[in-house]
Amino acid sequence: MWTLVLNSGSSSLKFALLNPASGEVRLSGLAERLGTPAAAVKLEHSGQQESRSLEGGSYDAALGEVLRELETLGMRSAVRAVGHRVVHGGERFSAPVLVTPEVLEAVRACVPLAPLHNPANIVGIEAAQQAFPKLPHVAVFDTAFHQTMPEVAYRYAVPEAWYSQHGVRRYGFHGTSHAYVAGRAAEMLQRPLPTLNLITAHLGNGASVCAVAGGRSVDTSMGLTPLEGLIMGSRSGDVDPGLHDYLARQAGLSLSEITAALNKESGLLGLSGLTNDMRELEKAALTGHRGARLALGAFIYRLAKCMAGMAVALGRVDGVVFTGGIGENSRTVRGETLRRLGVLGLHLDEEANKALPRGDVGVISLPGGPVALVIPTHEELMIARETAVIVGGRGYAL
């Protein structure tokens, strides 16, 4: 069975054609700057890369290029299902679902919770339904994995009406990634996932930590929105909620201006005054750049503090997992974080951490305590697998 996985952003469309059983990727790519004259698509297959301009620059045009490439590869008829990443499923969706008109309406109802993401996800689904009208489409939600959190973990200490009437609670994100690396960790450790307590850290431009007990999320660092939690590339992470009122009075900023700054001008970028790119910050820190050193130090401190806190949710920690662009590639972030986590019994294997090739999988801790793992995430494969489960369970021919 071949599954086409689509991730529709506000101005982009990421796609991959995968075999969920073997993990083979036959085609992948990214359409960027959709809605502008500069729209283009990058395709990769059989080790070859190609870039093309997109006339019209729409989601339909991008999917048209995907269809043409599938025809060229002789794979269009092999596609049996389409899996869609959907950022926010609210409280309604705790698992992937077959896309129906009712499901689309429910996703629309979640737009206030994810105004930047869900509208684009909906547009992508509807365009794909036009392009593949006879195939089953499955929605896989970033938030679904965290629906197993207990109420003490997901409720905010705010008026009950805010929760019951407006859905104000912690939802969490990056669920597909956290679920994938937890499963891979169980494979690497050769232990059944239901027996493991893991702390997973998805570290990229967006970053979050998750406490995974027996394969179920029991706490996570992101909340109502992806702004809560860790310091991120350009997002602030946790700040005092009173900051909005203070800046409105002292600086005359509007609510939307403050929110935009917390999302786009803060985090590593705001602290360093330089960049949101961890690679560049590490280089600058080595030359003595004060802002870069502050940003790097604060990122690691807050990450270690959050990971240590997740031990409370688990009670026992069997392992920690680093994933995402920073987690997979930054020896500095991994090493300095693990040094701070000695309180959990973790002991860094400095040689293993230094020797691990960038983007590779491996163990970077010494024996005698919880295991520290580096595992590249593969959200597209996880979406393909979950799509296959839903489609197979509905009796579609695979």
Swiss-Prot record:
Q: What is its EC number?
A: 2.7.2.1
Q: Which InterPro entries match?
A: Ac/propionate_kinase, Aliphatic_acid_kin_short-chain, Aliphatic_acid_kinase_CS, ATPase_NBD
Q: Which pathway does the record list? A: Metabolic intermediate biosynthesis; acetyl-CoA biosynthesis; acetyl-CoA from acetate: step 1/2
Keyword check for Transcription regulation, yes or no: no
UniProt remark on cofactor binding:
Mg(2+). Can also accept Mn(2+).
Record-listed ATP binding positions: 14, 202-206, 277-279, 325-329
Site note Transition state stabilizer applies to: 174, 235
Q: What class of enzyme is it?
A: transferase
Q: Which residues form the active site?
A: 142 (proton donor/acceptor)
Entry cofactors: Mg(2+); Mn(2+)
Q: Name one GO molecular function term.
A: magnesium ion binding
Binding of Mg(2+) occurs at 7, 379
The residues that cross the membrane are none
Q: For this UniProt entry, what's an example GO CC term?
A: cytosol
Intracellular or extracellular location(s) = Cytoplasm
Provide the alphabetized UniProt keywords. Answer: ATP-binding, Cytoplasm, Kinase, Magnesium, Metal-binding, Nucleotide-binding, Transferase
Q: What is its main location?
A: cytoplasm
Reaction equations catalysed: acetate + ATP = acetyl phosphate + ADP
Q: Where does substrate bind?
A: 85
Annotated GO biological process: acetate metabolic process; acetyl-CoA biosynthetic process
Q: Which family does it belong to?
A: Belongs to the acetokinase family.
Query: What does the function comment of this entry state?
Result: Catalyzes the formation of acetyl phosphate from acetate and ATP. Can also catalyze the reverse reaction.
Complex and partners: Homodimer.
This chain belongs to the protein called Acetate kinase
Q: Which organism is it from?
A: Deinococcus radiodurans (strain ATCC 13939 / DSM 20539 / JCM 16871 / CCUG 27074 / LMG 4051 / NBRC 15346 / NCIMB 9279 / VKM B-1422 / R1)
What high-level taxonomic lineage is stated for the organism?
Bacteria, Thermotogati, Deinococcota, Deinococci, Deinococcales
